[in-house]
Amino acid sequence: MPFTLTLKPKKAKGGQVYYPLQLNVVSKPAPGPNEVLIQLEAAALNHRDFFLRQNLYPGLSFKSPMLSDGCGTVVELGPGCTTASNQLLGKKVILTPFRGWDSDPEGPEDYSNFSTIGGVEPHFDLGMAQNYISVHESEVELLPEHLNHIEGAALPCCGITAWRALVTKSGNAKPGRNILVTGIGGGVAIQTLLFGVAMGCNMYVSSSSDEKLAKARELGAVGTVNYKTDSDSWDKTLGSLLPAERPYLDAVIDGAGGNIVTKALTVLKPGGVIVCYGMTVGPVMDWPMQAALKNVDLRGTMVGSRAEFREMVEFISTHKIKPVISRTVRGLDCVDAIDGLFEDIRTGKQFGKLVIEI
């Protein structure tokens, strides 16, 4: 019997609530014209899902299944599917985690029609915390052969966000460039590190955990700093780690916000780039005058286009990159165990992706 996992309504103000998870019995969907029916095998959590439970993310829906990231097997084709989709029958695929962004490198072609799926309006039937999902045939990509379903589910949101931040927005995805990734441990930060290493960049990372920094070095980081134990001077410590022939950062990829601009100024080159894909510290970011005088370029970013998604999957397939999995639980009906994954996000415990094996 198919299930969906949604949020259960509860009266409270945004930021003062934590909606419980609710398991629902549903009917198996049928694929419409040019749609493929996928039996989902794994789904992954993102920070946005934690924000949704606190009513801190726009468009919250109590009808829509949770989670944006999923991987499964194509089990049925709707009428009118192309020859390419016919070849996907019985194959494992990963799904795009958004709708309404085709190929424009500057952003969605029509912002009013863009949204990330999972737990939000208007896509009441789209979300990866369910047994079956029917989507347009253009919204899937063949799972790279070297990945399993758990690793495939870990890719969509963090993969496309990291790809766009590093490749499209930073302009520094080149051999020998010095890149800082802040807050290593989350999915986007780790995936950015993996992409940068594969591209020949000198990747530096920061964290408040020495254990996470050690793991990052194992993944290819050439330098690490602890912004908790070295809170007053981690920027100077980082500067001492940079190569003599290129003693500055070319770009910073940041998901925290806060005072990152101020701290990065001492090591960022004139005209350097800071790419911001999130603000977990708070919704406001410092912007000192020194940043303007140094011609620092601050660029916001979010997920990416279908075209970038295809590029990302192809790169992962070519370079045999595997996402890092922090922890998995088995069973969509194991609500208490799934709540434990959300607790890992709340405490910052995870290193890599948190995945439900459906």
UniProtKB/Swiss-Prot annotation:
CDD domains recorded: MDR7
EC class name: oxidoreductase
Transmembrane segments: none
Induction: Expression is positively regulated by the phomenoic acid biosynthesis cluster-specific transcription regulator C6TF.
Keyword ATP-binding included in the entry's annotation: no
Gene3D superfamilies named in the record: Medium-chain alcohol dehydrogenases, catalytic domain, NAD(P)-binding Rossmann-like Domain
A GO molecular-function descriptor: oxidoreductase activity
This enzyme's EC code(s): 1.-.-.-
Keyword terms: Oxidoreductase
Record-linked InterPro entries: ADH-like_C, ADH-like_N, GroES-like_sf, NAD(P)-bd_dom_sf, PKS_ER, Zinc_ADH-like
Domain of life from the UniProt record: Eukaryota
Pathway(s) the chain acts in: Secondary metabolite biosynthesis
Oxidoreductase as UniProt keyword: yes
Any Pfam family matching the protein: ADH_zinc_N
UniProt family annotation: Belongs to the zinc-containing alcohol dehydrogenase family. Quinone oxidoreductase subfamily.
PANTHER family reported in the protein's UniProt record: DEHYDROGENASE, PUTATIVE (AFU_ORTHOLOGUE AFUA_2G13270)-RELATED (PTHR45033:SF3), PTHR45033
Function, as annotated: Zinc-type alcohol dehydrogenase-like protein; part of the gene cluster that mediates the biosynthesis of phomenoic acid, a long chain aliphatic carboxylic acid that does not appear to be essential for pathogenicity but may play a role in allowing to outcompete other fungi in the environmental niche via its antifungal properties. The polyketide synthase produces the long methylated aliphatic carboxylic acid chain of phomenoic acid. The cluster-specific cytochrome P450 monooxygenase may then hydroxylate the methyl group of carbon 31.
Record-given protein name: Zinc-type alcohol dehydrogenase-like protein YogA
Native source species: Leptosphaeria maculans (strain JN3 / isolate v23.1.3 / race Av1-4-5-6-7-8) (Blackleg fungus)
